[in-house]
Amino acid sequence: MSAWRKLYYNTLNLPLKLLVKSKRVPTDPITELGLDTSRSFLYVLPYHSKADLLTLRQQCLSLGLPDPLQPIEINGTKLPAYVFIDDGPRVFRYYSPDPRKDSVKTFHAYLDAHRNNPHLDIEMLPASVMFGRSPGREGHNGVPHLRLLNGIQKFIAILWLGRDSFVRFSPTVSMRQMANEHGTDTSIARKLARVARIHFSRQRLAAVGPKLPARQDLFNKLLASKAIEKAIEDEAKAKKITLDKARKNATDIMEEIAANFSYEAVRMTDRVLSWTWNKLYQGINVFNAERVRQLAQDGHEIVYVPCHRSHMDYLLLSYVLYHQGLVPPHIAAGINLNFWPAGPIFRHLGAFFIRRTFKGNKLYSTIFREYLGELFSRGYSIEYFVEGGRSRTGRLLDPKTGTLSMTVQAMLRGETRPISIVPIYIGYEHVMEVATYAKELRGATKEKEGFMQMIRGLRKLRNLGQGYVNFGEPISLSQYLNQAVPDWRDDIDPIEPQRPSWLNPAVSALADNIMVNINNAASINAINLVSTALLASRQRALTKEQLLEQIDCYLQLLRNVPYSSDMVVPDKSSETLLAHALQTDKFQVEQDSLGDIIILPRESAVLMTYYRNNTIHLMVTPSLIASIVLHHERIHRDDLMKQVELIFPLIKAELFIRYEKEELPDVVNTLISELCRQRLICCADDGILRINPARIRPLQLLAASVRETLQRYGITLSLLNFAPEISRALLERESRILAQRLSVLHGINAPEFFDKAVFSTLVSTLREEGYLKDNEDILKADASALYQVIAKLMSPEIRLTIESVGVTEDNNSAQAIEENPESNMDK
């Protein structure tokens, strides 16, 4: 590098060091993109900008990557280590005025070098730099993305947006592979430049999103749609009002629903949240984000469908996506959050509000459906919670399919952009609402969201541990429909909304697939593991050595027999995980002369079931195997398999387990082998499985994870055994009553133990599996064999309590128990 050029770069670099603090996407490109820092890279930038080049250089040097300003020497010839694909503003034009020709020339020089040197392999590393990510407004002729700003404008942009800049690294491309597969002539060099240009264009659209419409223009377009025009006419006729009044009602609904996205609001909120997360959380862990970035770059319309644990989910996911180089989505939020000042803030951050129910309100449902379709057609990513509300128990709720159904209907409008649904697992080491959830499950009235509740909630924001966001396996909507409904395209109508007969069953199956994929992406943390172990102990206490032994048991199971390829298991030791969990002040430590005892306080037991339930689906199958071996003490492998196959459909439906019936034998055999390897059970050559007395405690604790689930099944099956002909409503009610009684008598702390939805799911599954038959409102049961299998897996005292209570028609006693469900929680 000449002295003059070095002076130029050093001079230009001075203000950049002060003004620019760029973020990397991905955060760790060395690991996520598999970059080898010992190799040489040709850095490919989208357009000519020395500010971008020097910003990239800062990040490269901090990562230990080669210096972009240091030429690469090949056989005595020095070639530049960077190339600009397109033109851009420059103060000094000592280069050729046409970077397009320069890029082709540089690519050809590298390809030619690879032709002459068979052992050479330079990798192209695409990298783009963005200062600000405002998409602009429709109808404005402003220059997009700072692409053609002159030197002064660029300086002002850097001055204002230097700390909102991103350096996006993309996967490398091997020049050796290009030369071998496509040749080395000039046409290949031109093709490389053209492909790079398209790559950067798509990448920028994924990061910035389409231009935003003026809100009133959007309303006018919606009002002009045939579906809404007809709904307005029907509204006027039904309510006997004028068309103008009906149109005013429609506009009011649009005002209530529609987002008012603002880039400046996102940018300022990002600064606040960055400070907030650093103060409140010890870290936000993000996994598998590259698959979403790739979908966005490939032009997919993305629907983010996370599980719903907390109000924090809204902010956390948008924050994570923004820092992954993606445009924050438009978010379907409950109308309960539309209060001052949260409502206007959320609306500027992309939230659109949805009522809890709009059954029977044709005008509202039509407007909401058309608004959702308009978001899709404009290319905005969307986020909604398919569970419909926050889980109060920590387990996934049964999905609500209304918005998902409208998403499928958007496909039936004939839009060409592919729609991909991305299930997302969100996990926390501390959920600030968990105490409120416990009160609501005890029967307390849900407190209405408002300004004062928000202020009280802010006071609880401290020591929140770590957060986890794991992007699950995407579901291509068109591919799903091709498999589920091969002729679905016959129902495409760009004007009239369609509700074909296949819609409801297809959407229900799709919703279940989404829930399974969310569970597949579970991210296990220290609180999940410690809570699971301590709650498995009847006294909610273990010595430190026992607890470490049990955490090790869980970790080995999860690592050696992974539930899915998307799940995340901590790579830390059990000692490190326990030390971290104890720092959260959720557990007590008592010391005596023999060592430490870790205790889960009685008042905290109900709260900690939430964190156990987040990942209970990972443990339930090995726990069932352990429970069968433990209670039988000696059982043949084939008999164990038969029992698992009988019980498993109930567990699969309740917890959205991924295993299909055909793969269950292989899964069970693999888990048995792992339990034998850990010496929890003994496996003989003749197929007999026995308990290992030397390792009985960890086997008991492992088996305990499924204990309450089996007890709940035993309750319903016992009632069916006692009264084979019973109405569904009475069966579900009596099951809940008996579960509440059992929890009081035996100190069962799990709030979901008598959850109405859980028993409803159980009865539905029993019906689907053929154990129940509908005869009008009466169920006819044939489930005695299943009950006998499950009854042998319960303790004698639990079984005695269950079987001593028959179905009672005494509504007074039933009502007394139902009106006081919190009695168990106070024990």
Curated annotation (Swiss-Prot):
Reactions the enzyme catalyzes: sn-glycerol 3-phosphate + an acyl-CoA = a 1-acyl-sn-glycero-3-phosphate + CoA
An individual GO BP term: fatty acid metabolic process
InterPro entries listed in its UniProt record: GPAT/DHAPAT, GPAT/DHAPAT_C, GPAT/DHAPAT_LPLAT, GPAT_PlsB, Plipid/glycerol_acylTrfase
Enzyme Commission number(s) of this protein: 2.3.1.15
Keyword Acyltransferase found: yes
Molecular function GO labels: glycerol-3-phosphate O-acyltransferase activity
Keyword Acyltransferase: yes
Pathway(s) where this gene product acts: Phospholipid metabolism; CDP-diacylglycerol biosynthesis; CDP-diacylglycerol from sn-glycerol 3-phosphate: step 1/3
Top-rank lineage group of the source organism: Bacteria
Short sequence motif HXXXXD motif: positions: 307-312
Localization per record: Cell inner membrane
Membrane topology designation: Peripheral membrane protein
Coiled coil start-end: none
Gene Ontology CC annotation, any one: plasma membrane
Chief subcellular location: membrane
Top enzyme class: transferase
Keywords, sorted A to Z: Acyltransferase, Cell inner membrane, Cell membrane, Lipid biosynthesis, Lipid metabolism, Membrane, Phospholipid biosynthesis, Phospholipid metabolism, Transferase
Family membership noted in the UniProt record: Belongs to the GPAT/DAPAT family.
Comment text on domains: The HXXXXD motif is essential for acyltransferase activity and may constitute the binding site for the phosphate moiety of the glycerol-3-phosphate.
Full protein name: Glycerol-3-phosphate acyltransferase
Species this chain originates from: Proteus mirabilis (strain HI4320)
Higher taxonomy: Bacteria, Pseudomonadati, Pseudomonadota, Gammaproteobacteria, Enterobacterales
Gene: plsB
